A protein has these predicted regions:
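Conserved ABC ATPase signature
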Residues: 6-10
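Conserved catalytic motifs of ABC-family nucleotide-binding domains
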Residues: 27
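Catalytic Walker B motif of ABC-type/P-loop ATPase nucleotide-binding domains
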Residues: 31-34
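Helical segment within the ABC ATPase nucleotide-binding domain
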Residues: 46-59
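H-loop/switch region of ABC-family ATPase nucleotide-binding domains
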Residues: 68-69
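ABC ATPase nucleotide-binding domains
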Residues: 107-127
């Protein structure tokens, strides 16, 4: 889609998609994405996540490690989660087992409600 464009002229979201495509050329077994949605607006972030979902279905042999700071970026293709707090392992396991009100409230030291709507998560502070 962007083959005749200079990378510097593309939007941040387009650049992220190009970088993922470049990484896939070598047919990797592992794709590590460190905050790939950082700096993206809502639409670009959702487009990136859709690209990853498509990739997961088309290339199920690829393991994706996705590093994020926001729970909203967790999509159904991810089956496990590892939460760090202050550089230490805070919680890990299956997403439904870890993303609970109790665990997230403990993480933030506040009452938190985890909302799962159509397999997408969000957090709401209570009180």
């Amino acid at each position: 889609e962007f083959e005749n464009e200079y990378l510097g002229y593309l939007s941040t979201g387009q650049q992220q998609r190009v970088m993922i495509a470049r990484a896939l050329i070598s047919n990797p077994e592992l794709l590590i994405l460190d905050e790939p949605a950082s700096g993206l607006d809502y639409l670009a972030r959702e487009t990136l996540l859709e690209v990853l979902e498509t990739l997961s279905h088309e290339r199920p042999e690829i393991t994706i490690i996705y590093v994020a700071h926001f729970i909203e970026e967790i999509i159904p293709i991810f089956d496990k989660i590892f939460i760090l707090s202050k550089g230490m392992n805070f919680a890990q396991g299956k997403i439904d087992d870890v993303l609970t009100n109790k665990t997230m409230s403990s993480l933030f030291n506040r009452n938190v409600e985890v909302v799962n709507y159509k397999n997408r998560f969000s957090l709401h502070m209570i009180g």
